[in-house]
Amino acid sequence: RERGNSWDPIDTFLVNWASVATNIYDGLTYRGADLKLVPGLATAWEELDEGKRIRFTLREGVKFHDGEPFNAEAVKFTFDRLLGEEGKKGPQRSNYAAIDKVEIIDAKTVDFHLKAPDPVLLTKLAGYGAMIVPPKYIQEKGDDYFNAHPVGTGPFKAVSYEPKIGIKLEAFADHWGGAPKLSNLEYRFIAEPATAVAELQAGRVDLVIPPTIPVGMIPTIQADPKLEVVSTAGPTVYALRFNTKSGPTADERVRKALILGVDRDAIIQTILGGQAAPIASFQGALSFGNDPDMKPLPYDPEKAKALLKEAGIATGTTLQIDVRGNDSTFNEVSQAIASYLQVIGLNATIKPYETNVLLNDIIPAGKTGAMFEQAWGGWTLDYDNTAYSMYHSGEKWNPYDSDPKLDALLESQRSITDRAKREEILKSIAHYTVDRALEIPLYNYNAIFGVSKRVKNFTPVPDSRLRLTDVTVE
């Protein structure tokens, strides 16, 4: 659970924040546990001008928690704010960069004018940066007040918020989708996994949400007859990415040898308790663009040794793996990888960094070792979200590689609104990155929930956006 300091949708990128806020706010579109996009505050939409304009028909008779009416004004206010000065301060704005302006046609119709077509925009509008906020309330109370006293149109309304302690919500009886079954929700921010599990066992917590529970604590929960572990494939994928510019990993044969030299299935079973699935490219099975026919390269240490020999790599060559120091599970995984690499004659050293140092200073500046940990949880579950950031020349997460063919593929799919055509291009991008061996694709980690058996009608969601409208507690 998160130590969020602001409940303003444009201020954060934390998935845990969204598990609370998805109960307070609504977006124009909504994506539930089945990942299908359905109407939210918009009842219908149509693409005009070859995808450069989208017209939304808005739901009528909807009210914000403070009684203010939801209408076209609220939609325009929300996006003017997101794309203006206020949005500049937060991390959400770049997701919506395709939007040029929002035009009010009438009280229940708005047109989104786009700078260029964005095939993922309708999904992004279900995302938490695009939650619709109340104009009058924010103009009267100010942004700082809104941060701590959120108001939306969602099924629950905020009652009280204490930073670092928790937030209390109560059912919003006038929700357009009908009142939720629970009368109250209380979210507690518990930083320590052991404390969260102890509270679950004591019956003071009914549900612990990802990514709180480490694999090592699963047996404790499973051993308690009052509790259960519920898991589902999540959006987070892990890989060891390569320095393709210099050193031994600049050679594609060496990169392929490193992939063949690691037994990913064994790592999943022994270290991750089976709570992950192997991946063939840097995306999970739920990702739009994943090719289910593409299989991960098998563990083959003999073939790996032959490739290293062919590339002229001496036995005992040292390679550095950069990891996030606070990720204890991945530290174990990287130790196992180092042991596997020893088997094929390489000496892997592990260099831990503080997470923000690795992400903001080391990777973007191209100062990593031969390999570096990359965990990515694109909540859109659209491969573009991952692939463009990881492989396009000049992107923050791609300090080493520049491939004009890959750039052209990545750019071409961004302007295509035909889903089937786009999916084919995304699949071909995945195949191309695997042919070039741009990383060791490791695994897609599950979203793990600890649940009291008193909780009924609970459906785990892959993207942490846990809407608790149908849940009951005995």
Regions found by a protein language model. Name each.
Residues 170-173, 232-257, 261:
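A bilobed periplasmic-binding-protein/Venus flytrap-type ligand-binding module shared by bacterial periplasmic
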Residues 162, 262-289, 329-338, 360-474:
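Detector for C-terminal structural segments
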Residues 144, 171-219, 347:
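Ligand-site clamp/hinge motif
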Residues 36, 126-180, 184, 302:
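Gly/Pro-rich hinge or "lid" segments in bacterial periplasmic/extracellular proteins
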Residues 156, 277-310, 327-332:
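Structural transition elements
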Residues 43-88, 105, 111-113, 199, ...:
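Aromatic- and charge-enriched surface segment that lines or borders ligand/interaction sites
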Residues 1-49, 80, 151-152, 450:
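N-terminal lobe/hinge region of extracytoplasmic solute-binding protein
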Residues 57, 93-136, 160:
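Surface-exposed binding/hinge segments that line
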